Amino acid sequence: MTDDDSETSASETQAQEESDLPVFQLCGLVEELSYGNSALKTETEMFEKYYNKLELKDQRPPRLSEIKITGAEIAQLRSRRKSKSRMGMERVMGLSVDQKLELVQKELEDTKDEIRHMRANAERDLQHHEAIIEEAEIRWTEVQKEVHDFEKDILKTISKKKGSILATQKVMKYIEDMNRRRDNMKDKLRLKNVSLKVQRKKLLLQLRQKEEVGEALHDVDFQQLKIENAQFLETIEARNQELIQMKLASGNTLQILNAYKRSSLLKTSRVVILQSKLHHAMQMSLNLTKEFLLRKELLEKIEKETLQAEEDRAKALALNKQLRKQLSEFRAPQVMIYIWEKIRNGDLEKTIRMWERKVEIAEMSLKGYRKAWNKMKTTNEQLQAISGPGK
């Protein structure tokens, strides 16, 4: 019987035995196998990690003779979940205890190195965050001081001139002076930083020259150089931090300046709106004044017309009174006298019309006589004119 047949029969026997076990024993067996699988998984990951390191170190695909973990080991790691009899058989083909100990020690050293790197990174991050917090506290103190100075120097002096152009100009001048001072400080720090870098380069050059000449440096000299280098690095870092703070302050100042510019533009627009409203109000006032004068003239005219109407009314009353008086004194004639006067008036009108016709007839006769006279006169003149040359 071959090995495969024996393994198959052993697995079938174990499966039959496991099927005969009760449920709680099966649960315990499952837990035990799960624990073993987790341990094997951890061990496999460790082996794979070590194998990957070897591959990176060799930079070439390893041969089967150079691999410490043989194919039998891989088969053994994959088949650990099989029967106990087969597990016992494969343990003989696995790694030795010394090999496993060596792998575990290397993994432990790598883990310690990673922990040291993580601790160093964490300390560096902690120092960075502490520096940021310290910088923020310093910046907050400076901002409070600047706000106090601004309120003391500017706000209290321009509170009574709110909205005026002089107040805006004063604020702009204050901000420009502050920016100028910060720029000067930034230039000074930059020059100091450049000088420190130049000094550091000189020291490095001297150190390189000494190494080239072959002078032996003692540990004390190296320690002194390290201390000086650390001091210079701290100074450079401090100058860089001050430069960063100045840049932040300059950026904040520019933001404040832009805010005041926007506020000034808003105030200027409000002033323009108020001026337009004032112009509109003045125009309306002029229109109202003109209308008031027109109404006043109209009122004076109405008063004059009222006085004239009063005078006319007085005259009309006087005339009415006079007419009433005449009417009261009027006496109508008797009827016969009135009829007689009426007949007489009619006769007189007839006589007048008759004489008017006679006058018209006489005028027509006169016109005829004048025409005949003129004709005779003309004829006589013609005759005289004709007879004159004959004499």
UniProtKB/Swiss-Prot annotation:
<keyword id="KW-0175">Coiled coil</keyword>
<dbReference type="Pfam" id="PF13870">
    <property type="entry name" value="CCDC113_CCDC96_CC"/>
</dbReference>
<keyword id="KW-0966">Cell projection</keyword>
<comment type="similarity">
    <text>Belongs to the CFAP263 family.</text>
</comment>
<dbReference type="GO" id="GO:0005930">
    <property type="term" value="C:axoneme"/>
</dbReference>
<comment type="subunit">
    <text>Forms a complex with CFAP184; the interaction is required for functional activity in cilia. Interacts with HAP1 and PCM1.</text>
</comment>
<dbReference type="InterPro" id="IPR025254">
    <property type="entry name" value="CCDC113/CCDC96_CC"/>
</dbReference>
<comment type="function">
    <text>Component of centriolar satellites contributing to primary cilium formation. In complex with CFAP263, acts as a regulator of ciliary beating that connects radial spoke 3 (RS3) to the inner dynein arm (IDA) and the nexin-dynein regulatory complex (N-DRC). The complex is positioned parallel to N-DRC and forms a connection between the arch at the base of RS3, the IDA tail and N-DRC.</text>
</comment>
<keyword id="KW-0970">Cilium biogenesis/degradation</keyword>
<feature type="coiled-coil region">
    <location>
        <begin position="294"/>
        <end position="369"/>
    </location>
</feature>
<dbReference type="GO" id="GO:0060271">
    <property type="term" value="P:cilium assembly"/>
</dbReference>
<dbReference type="GO" id="GO:0034451">
    <property type="term" value="C:centriolar satellite"/>
</dbReference>
<protein>
    <recommendedName>
        <fullName>Cilia- and flagella-associated protein 263</fullName>
    </recommendedName>
</protein>
<dbReference type="InterPro" id="IPR051885">
    <property type="entry name" value="CC_domain-Cilium_Assoc"/>
</dbReference>
<feature type="coiled-coil region">
    <location>
        <begin position="95"/>
        <end position="243"/>
    </location>
</feature>
<feature type="region of interest" description="Disordered">
    <location>
        <begin position="1"/>
        <end position="21"/>
    </location>
</feature>
<dbReference type="GO" id="GO:0036064">
    <property type="term" value="C:ciliary basal body"/>
</dbReference>
<keyword id="KW-0206">Cytoskeleton</keyword>
<dbReference type="GO" id="GO:0032991">
    <property type="term" value="C:protein-containing complex"/>
</dbReference>
<keyword id="KW-0963">Cytoplasm</keyword>
